Amino acid sequence: MSGAPTAGAALMLCAATAVLLSAQGGPVQSKSPRFASWDEMNVLAHGLLQLGQGLREHAERTRSQLSALERRLSACGSACQGTEGSTDLPLAPESRVDPEVLHSLQTQLKAQNSRIQQLFHKVAQQQRHLEKQHLRIQHLQSQFGLLDHKHLDHEVAKPARRKRLPEMAQPVDPAHNVSRLHRLPRDCQELFQVGERQSGLFEIQPQGSPPFLVNCKMTSDGGWTVIQRRHDGSVDFNRPWEAYKAGFGDPHGEFWLGLEKVHSITGDRNSRLAVQLRDWDGNAELLQFSVHLGGEDTAYSLQLTAPVAGQLGATTVPPSGLSVPFSTWDQDHDLRRDKNCAKSLSGGWWFGTCSHSNLNGQYFRSIPQQRQKLKKGIFWKTWRGRYYPLQATTMLIQPMAAEAAS
């Protein structure tokens, strides 16, 4: 009879569902458990839901088939009983239906129908269970997503420091940085004031400027922002105006911070400029000046108001109140009318008469013999002379307010 195998198949499908559920919830015997991803859990949940729906449809079809078979047998039983009561035509022995057999078949059909009802009920229970499991999975997914966002927010909330950038000109996304000041510090001195004592790379955000990366040098005098460093000739400093405006180089090696960034740090405030020089014999010199840097509308003019520390000859700086604009080979703003100092020498600088200093000149790993080459080098006239190419230089800046704060 076809009803029994169909019901058996449905029971086997139900058993397979139970096995899948027990396998999902049972303990893992492996010593190194592998946790399923959320996508795999979704696939499993949807698969189980489809299996439950298939079992339900199978049970409904089986019950419908059994009902139709029961009706046919009932009709056959009535016809057979009517034929048995008639004596007009003799019936063949094989065409006679024993009432006991009919009763037995009907009993079996009722029992089968009862089992189908039970199976249908179990399938409905399994489907409700799967729906609950699916809701639990969705809830866990939402909780997992919330925890993931909280983890990301926690990572964002950490002060991001000492991150590398391939070029000094690249800005930093402010959404990825939150400082202990509830904002990024304006400069390295502000970092020093909130307790930072370790030198390194930090992200700052001067007022009205996007965030950017700077080298901070922490000393007993406070925090200094490094704006230039030369020591090995790895970076070409003979660049056009836009490069000097934006900045270039490697923050871990040689670099120029950028005129616009330096101006955003100093703003309208007077600042201290420190210049560190080193020759090829290991001798070092430190010079400090009180300076004010103008904006691009002044060609980033540098005004040296007065010496703050170190020895500086009177002939090496312009008179008090005189500003020296910044020049490059493609934008000549120097004080020489008959010469483009940046083109004649090398690199961009605050050229006055082309002869007192140029810390962005060509780097020489050994001192050349030709005087024409020597004049293109890195020099500071009042310390080692006009034609002595220096081995290393560093320029640092700090707001003048630091003097009162320290």
Swiss-Prot record:
Detected in blood plasma (at protein level). Detected in liver. Detected in white fat tissue and placenta. Expressed at high levels in the placenta, heart, liver, muscle, pancreas and lung but expressed poorly in the brain and kidney. GO terms for molecular function: enzyme inhibitor activity; identical protein binding; lipase binding; lipase inhibitor activity. CDD domains: FReD (cd00087). It is found in: Secreted; Secreted, Extracellular space, Extracellular matrix. Glycans are attached at N177. Changing W349C: Impaired protein folding. The keyword Glycoprotein applies. Residues 179-401 form the Fibrinogen C-terminal domain. Induction: Up-regulated when cells are exposed to severe hypoxia (in vitro). The keyword Oxidoreductase does not apply. Disulfide bonds join C188-C216, C341-C354. SMART domains: FBG (SM00186). GO terms for biological process: angiogenesis; blood coagulation; endothelial cell apoptotic process; lipid metabolic process; negative regulation of apoptotic process; negative regulation of endothelial cell apoptotic process; negative regulation of fatty acid biosynthetic process; negative regulation of very-low-density lipoprotein particle remodeling. N-glycosylated. Cleaved into a smaller N-terminal chain and a larger chain that contains the fibrinogen C-terminal domain; both cleaved and uncleaved forms are detected in the extracellular space. The cleaved form is not present within the cell. InterPro entries: FIB_ANG-like (IPR037579), Fibrinogen-like_C (IPR036056), Fibrinogen_a/b/g_C_1 (IPR014716), Fibrinogen_a/b/g_C_dom (IPR002181), Fibrinogen_CS (IPR020837). Residues 100-143 form a coiled coil. The record marks R164, L165 as: Cleavage. Homooligomer; disulfide-linked via Cys residues in the N-terminal part of the protein. The homooligomer undergoes proteolytic processing to release the ANGPTL4 C-terminal chain, which circulates as a monomer. The homooligomer unprocessed form is able to interact with the extracellular matrix. PANTHER family: FIBRINOGEN ALPHA CHAIN. Mediates inactivation of the lipoprotein lipase LPL, and thereby plays a role in the regulation of triglyceride clearance from the blood serum and in lipid metabolism. May also play a role in regulating glucose homeostasis and insulin sensitivity. Inhibits proliferation, migration, and tubule formation of endothelial cells and reduces vascular leakage. This is Angiopoietin-related protein 4. It comes from Homo sapiens.
